[in-house]
C-alpha cells in the first residue's frame, strides 16, 4: 500500500485537521477510519483509495494548502462490512475513535475539539469479529526469526481463539512449516526481507507479508514481551525455548501489541508443537494434491471440501488443521480411529450427537471476543448455548466409550467443571431469547433476572404509558384529533399537529400551556412543561436501565475471563467430537474403511479410490474404477518402486494422487476410501504431478519440474511416500529420458522409499529387470473400431504403447492432422532398431565424425594466423593462392 502519511502543508491547518494529520502521521501504512459522530471518515489519499475499493462517494471537506480535501465515509454501525472489503482488498485499517463526548470536550473550553485515539489496527491476521472472519477457516498470524546456524523459529497465533505455538525448525523446511497453518498474515524483520527463503515464500504464500523493524526480532525483546504479556518474572514455567524462538515470539507479540493499540493481549501461553510427530508436506506437494486449496485458489474440489461433514465452526477448523498437519504417532492416530469406529457403529447415536452439535455456536471465538472487549450479548448467549449443547451431546454418548471419546464426554459433561455449568445456566436464564449484538443497545437482560433493573424499567415503561395518556389529554384539550406526541434525538419528546390546525395553539389561551418549538412545511411542533418533565424522567430511567445492563454484562465478562481455561478445554472437546462424527458420517456415505497400521513401511491397498474424483463422478451418476496397490519399502513382500505406464487420460495421475491422499487421510485420523488398507506410517509425502511456469521467479515449466524433483531426491527417506508423474517431459526427448532414468535409479537405490513413478518413456520399463525392488504396472486401454476406450484399470506389466495419436483424436485435432500424425508414427516405428550399447534407449546412432587430413589442418592453421583487418588487397590475394596450394599438399 502506498504511504498516505501527512501531506505537505504550507498553510496552518484547522485544529480539527491538525488532530487528524497528527494521528495519521503515526500510522502511515494504514487507512485511517476517523470517527466523527455516526460515521468513520477518511481524508486525502485514504479517501480516494477507500472510495475506489468500497465503491462509495468521494466528496470533499474544506481545503488544505489551497486545495479541496478529498473525503469519504461509512456509517459506524455498518463499519464491519466495509472493513471486511478493505481487508480483502489488501488494506490495513487504523480505527480512530472519539475518546469523549462533545459535551465533555466543551467542559475543557468552548473551542476544544473531541479527543480521539487509535484503538485498533485491523489487519488480515488480527481479525476477531464474526463479520470479518470466515467461520469455518482458521486464521493464523505467524512471525519468523532466523539464527546464524541454518535454524529458524516460527511463532504462530490465532488472535480469534488465543492459540499460540512456538517452535524451532531447520530453515530449509520453512515452506513446509508455513503451509501447515491457515496463514492469514506473516510478519518478518525488515532485516530478513531479502533472504532467499523469504523471497521464495513470497512466491507460494497467498497471505500478505508485513515487515517490522529489526529491533523487534531479538531474543531480548521476545523475553521482555513474554514476561509482560503473561505476567511472569521468569520464563522457566513456559518451557525450554531457544533464543531464536524467543526472537520469533518477540516479533509476533510486538505486532499483536501494535495492532491492539494498548489493549491487553489475550493469548494462551506458548506451546511447542511436536513437529517431529507430523507428516511433512512441502508446498509443491500441498498444491498438486489440492488438500485444502484447489489449483484455482478456492476450496471446491479439494480433499477437505469432499470429506468435510462437520457441523460446528471449531470442528471445521480442527479438521482442516489435521489434514494440513497429519500425525505420525501410532497411538494418536489409533485413538482417532477408535472414536470414529465407535460412532460409526451406532447410526442412531451418531445422528443424535450431531443434532446436539449443530446447535453449538463457535465457543472459542465468542470467548476471545468477550475477553478482548469486542464481544456482546450474542457472544454471551453463544457461550451458554455451546456449553449446554455439549453437555447434551455428552449425555447421548453414554458409557462404554473408547478412551478418546470417554475423555471428550467427561469434559463436555461438565462433571469436573460445575462452575462452568452454573454460569452457562445462569446466562440462559439471564439473557433474552434474541439479544442484540452490542451491549450498548440494551434490552438483553431478561425480565426477572435483576430486581434493580426491573424497577428502573417499570419506571421507564410506566412513563411511556403516561405519554400515551398525555397524547389523549392534549388532543381533547385542543380539539385536534390529529395531535401526536413524538420523539427525535434533537427535540426529544414533542407535540406535533398539522400546520393547518396549529393556529389555536399559537394563540391564548392554549399558548399559555403549549410552547412553540418548531414550524415545518406541513406541521408545527410544541412542548409543555409537563411533557418536558416526563421526558426527563424517561430519559433518566432509560439511562439507568442501560447502565444497569452494562454493569451486569461487565460482571458476566469478568466471569468469562475467570473461566477462560476450562471454556477452552470444552471448546476443544466440542471440535474433537465434531471431527470424529464427521469422519464417521463420511465413512458411512462412501464405504471408507479403517486403515490397519503396520510397523513396517508398507502400503497394501485393495480397491483404492480417489475421494475427490469419485465424488465428482457420483454427481454425474457415474462410477469410479477402484484399483489395488502393493508397495513394501523393505522389499520383503513386494516392490517398493512401481513404474506405471499407459496412455494419457487412462488414469495414471489419478492413481498416483489417490495413493498419496490415502496416506494423508490415514495419518490425519480419517478412514480411507478402499476395500482395505494396510499402511506403514510415512514421515513425508512428496508429489511431483503436473507443473507450470513460475514467471515471477524466472522459472520455466521444466525448471519448476526439476526443482521439485531435486527436492524429492535430496530429502526423501526410506519412510517417505513419493509419487512422480512424467519426470523429464519438459525438455528434449533424450535429455528427458536420461533424467527420468537417473531419477528412477536414485529413488530405488539411494532413497529406498515407497514410490510410484509414472512415465511415457517405455524404455524405462526395462529397469524392473535390473532393479530388484522395482516392478511395472500399466493402465488398460482398448481400441474398438478405431476408437480408444480407457478402462482405468491398473494391471501388472508395462504398457505396449502410448496411444498418443488416438488421444489427440479424442481431444479434437483436425482429421487431417490426426491422419498425418498416424503416417509419421508408422515411419518412426519402422526406423532403425535400438542401439546395442544403450539397450534401454531406442535412439539412432549418429554417423562417425569425419577425420581431418594433414592438408586440412594446415589450411586451418593458416586461416587462424591471418588477420583480415590488416591485409591489403594484394596480401589477401596472395593468401588465397597460398591456401589453394596447401589444400593440394604442395
Swiss-Prot record:
Stored InterPro entries: DNA_mismatch_repair_MutS, DNA_mismatch_repair_MutS-lik_N, DNA_mismatch_repair_MutS/MSH, DNA_mismatch_repair_MutS_C, DNA_mismatch_repair_MutS_clamp, DNA_mismatch_repair_MutS_core, DNA_mismatch_repair_MutS_N, DNA_mismatch_repair_MutS_sf
Binding site for ATP: 646-653
Top-level taxon of the source organism: Bacteria
SUPFAM superfamilies, sorted: DNA repair protein MutS, domain I, DNA repair protein MutS, domain II, DNA repair protein MutS, domain III, P-loop containing nucleoside triphosphate hydrolases
Record protein name field: DNA mismatch repair protein MutS
Lineage: Bacteria, Pseudomonadati, Pseudomonadota, Alphaproteobacteria, Hyphomonadales
BP GO terms, sorted: mismatch repair
Function: This protein is involved in the repair of mismatches in DNA. It is possible that it carries out the mismatch recognition step. This protein has a weak ATPase activity.
HAMAP family in the cross-refs: MutS (MF_00096)
Organism field: Hyphomonas neptunium (strain ATCC 15444)
GO MF annotations, alphabetized: ATP binding; ATP-dependent DNA damage sensor activity; damaged DNA binding; mismatched DNA binding
Pfam families in alphabetical order: MutS_I, MutS_II, MutS_III, MutS_IV, MutS_V
Keyword vocabulary terms for this entry: ATP-binding, DNA damage, DNA repair, DNA-binding, Nucleotide-binding
GO cellular component: cytosol
UniProt keyword annotation of Nucleus present: no
Designated gene of the protein: mutS
Family from the record: Belongs to the DNA mismatch repair MutS family.
Amino acid at each position: 500500500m502506498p504511504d498516505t502519511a501527512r501531506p505537505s502543508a504550507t498553510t496552518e491547518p484547522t485544529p480539527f485537521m491538525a488532530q487528524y494529520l497528527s494521528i495519521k502521521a503515526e500510522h502511515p501504512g494504514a487507512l485511517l477510519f476517523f470517527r466523527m459522530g455516526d460515521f468513520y471518515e477518511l481524508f486525502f489519499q485514504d479517501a480516494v483509495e477507500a472510495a475506489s475499493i468500497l465503491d462509495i462517494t468521494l466528496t470533499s471537506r474544506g481545503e488544505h494548502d489551497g486545495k479541496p480535501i478529498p473525503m469519504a465515509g461509512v456509517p459506524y454501525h455498518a463499519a464491519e462490512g466495509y472493513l471486511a472489503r478493505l481487508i480483502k482488498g489488501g488494506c490495513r485499517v487504523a480505527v480512530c475513535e472519539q475518546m469523549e463526548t462533545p459535551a465533555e470536550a466543551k467542559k475543557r473550553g468552548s473551542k476544544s475539539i473531541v479527543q480521539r485515539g487509535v484503538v485498533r489496527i485491523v489487519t488480515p491476521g488480527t481479525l476477531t469479529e464474526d463479520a470479518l472472519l470466515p467461520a469455518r477457516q482458521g486464521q493464523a498470524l505467524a512471525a519468523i526469526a532466523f539464527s546464524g546456524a541454518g535454524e529458524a523459529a516460527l511463532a504462530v497465533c490465532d488472535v480469534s481463539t488465543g492459540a499460540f505455538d512456538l517452535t524451532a525448525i531447520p530453515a530449509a523446511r520453512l515452506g513446509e512449516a508455513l503451509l501447515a497453518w491457515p496463514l492469514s498474515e506473516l510478519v518478518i524483520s525488515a532485516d530478513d526481507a531479502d533472504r532467499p527463503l523469504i523471497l521464495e515464500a513470497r512466491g507460494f504464500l497467498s497471505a500478505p507479508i508485513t515487515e517490522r523493524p529489526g529491533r523487534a526480532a531479538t531474543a531480548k525483546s521476545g523475553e521482555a514481551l513474554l514476561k509482560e504479556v503473561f505476567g511472569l518474572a521468569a520464563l522457566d514455567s513456559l518451557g525450554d525455548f531457544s533464543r531464536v524462538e524467543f526472537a520469533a515470539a518477540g516479533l509476533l507479540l510486538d505486532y499483536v501489541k501494535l495492532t491492539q493499540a494498548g489493549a491487553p493481549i489475550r493469548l494462551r501461553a506458548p506451546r511447542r508443537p511436536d513437529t517431529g510427530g507430523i507428516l511433512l508436506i512441502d508446498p509443491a506437494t500441498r498444491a498438486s494434491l489440492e488438500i485444502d486449496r484447489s489449483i484455482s485458489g478456492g476450496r471446491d474440489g479439494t480433499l477437505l471440501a469432499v470429506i468435510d461433514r462437520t457441523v460446528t465452526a471449531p470442528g471445521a477448523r480442527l479438521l482442516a488443521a489435521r489434514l494440513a498437519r497429519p500425525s505420525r504417532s501410532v497411538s494418536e492416530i489409533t485413538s482417532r480411529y477408535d472414536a470414529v469406529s465407535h460412532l460409526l457403529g451406532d447410526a442412531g447415536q451418531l445422528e443424535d450427537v450431531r443434532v446436539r452439535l449443530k446447535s453449538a455456536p463457535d465457543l472459542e471465538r465468542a470467548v476471545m471476543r468477550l475477553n478482548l472487549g469486542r464481544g456482546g450479548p450474542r457472544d454471551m448467549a453463544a457461550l451458554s448455548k455451546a456449553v449446554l449443547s455439549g453437555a447434551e451431546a455428552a449425555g447421548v454418548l453414554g458409557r462404554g466409550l473408547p478412551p478418546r471419546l470417554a475423555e471428550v464426554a467427561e469434559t463436555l459433561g461438565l462433571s469436573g467443571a460445575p462452575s462452568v455449568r452454573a454460569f452457562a445456566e445462569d446466562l440462559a436464564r439471564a439473557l433474552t431469547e434474541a439479544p442484540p449484538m452490542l451491549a450498548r443497545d440494551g434490552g438483553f437482560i431478561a425480565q426477572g433476572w435483576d430486581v434493580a433493573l426491573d424497577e428502573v424499567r417499570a419506571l421507564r415503561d410506566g412513563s411511556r404509558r403516561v405519554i400515551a395518556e398525555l397524547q389523549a389529554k392534549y388532543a381533547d384539550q385542543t380539539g385536534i384529533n390529529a395531535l401526536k406526541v413524538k420523539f427525535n434525538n434533537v427535540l426529544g419528546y414533542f407535540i406535533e399537529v398539522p400546520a393547518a390546525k396549529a393556529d389555536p395553539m399559537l394563540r391564548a389561551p392554549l399558548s399559555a400551556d403549549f410552547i412553540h418549538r418548531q414550524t415545518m412545511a406541513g406541521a408545527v411542533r410544541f412542548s409543555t412543561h409537563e411533557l418536558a418533565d416526563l421526558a426527563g424522567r424517561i430519559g433518566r430511567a432509560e439511562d439507568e436501565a442501560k447502565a444497569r445492563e452494562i454493569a451486569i454484562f461487565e460482571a458476566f465478562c469478568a466471569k468469562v475471563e475467570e473461566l477462560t481455561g476450562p471454556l477452552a478445554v470444552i471448546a476443544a472437546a466440542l471440535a474433537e467430537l465434531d471431527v470424529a462424527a464427521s469422519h464417521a458420517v463420511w465413512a458411512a456415505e462412501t464405504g471408507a474403511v479403517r486403515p490397519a497400521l503396520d510397523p513396517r513401511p508398507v502400503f497394501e491397498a485393495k480397491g483404492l479410490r480417489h475421494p475427490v474424483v469419485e465424488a465428482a463422478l457420483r454427481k454425474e451418476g457415474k462410477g469410479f474404477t477402484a484399483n489395488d496397490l502393493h508397495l513394501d519399502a523393505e522389499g520383503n513382500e513386494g516392490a517398493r518402486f512401481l513404474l506405471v505406464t499407459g496412455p494419457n487420460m487412462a488414469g495414471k495421475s489419478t492413481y498416483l494422487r489417490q495413493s498419496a491422499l490415502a496416506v494423508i487421510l490415514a495419518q490425519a485420523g480419517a478412514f480411507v476410501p478402499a476395500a482395505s488398507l494396510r499402511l506403514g506410517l510415512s514421515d513425508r509425502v512428496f508429489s511431483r504431478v503436473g507443473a507450470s511456469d513460475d514467471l515471477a521467479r524466472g522459472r520455466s515449466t521444466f525448471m519448476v519440474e526439476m526443482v521439485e524433483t531435486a527436492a524429492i531426491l535430496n530429502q526423501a527417506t526410506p519412510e517417505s511416500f513419493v509419487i512422480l508423474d512424467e519426470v523429464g517431459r519438459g525438455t528434449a526427448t533424450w535429455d528427458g529420458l536420461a533424467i527420468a532414468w537417473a531419477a528412477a535409479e536414485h529413488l530405488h537405490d539411494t532413497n529406498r522409499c515407497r514410490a510410484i513413478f509414472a512415465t511415457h518413456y517405455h524404455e524405462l520399463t526395462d529397469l524392473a529387470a535390473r532393479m530388484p525392488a522395482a516392478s511395472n504396472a500399466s493402465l488398460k486401454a482398448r481400441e474398438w473400431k478405431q476408437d480408444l476406450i480407457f478402462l482405468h484399470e491398473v494391471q501388472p506389466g508395462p504398457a505396449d504403447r502410448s496411444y498418443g495419436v488416438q488421444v489427440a483424436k479424442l481431444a479434437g485435432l483436425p482429421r487431417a492432422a490426426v491422419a498425418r500424425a498416424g503416417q509419421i508414427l508408422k515411419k518412426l516405428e519402422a526406423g532403425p532398431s535400438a542401439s546395442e550399447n544403450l539397450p534401454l534407449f531406442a535412439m539412432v546412432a549418429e554417423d562417425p565424425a569425419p577425420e581431418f587430413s594433414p592438408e586440412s589442418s594446415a589450411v586451418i592453421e593458416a586461416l587462424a594466423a591471418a588477420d583480415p583487418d590488416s591485409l591489403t588487397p594484394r596480401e589477401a590475394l596472395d593468401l588465397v593462392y597460398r591456401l589453394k596450394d596447401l589444400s593440394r599438399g604442395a
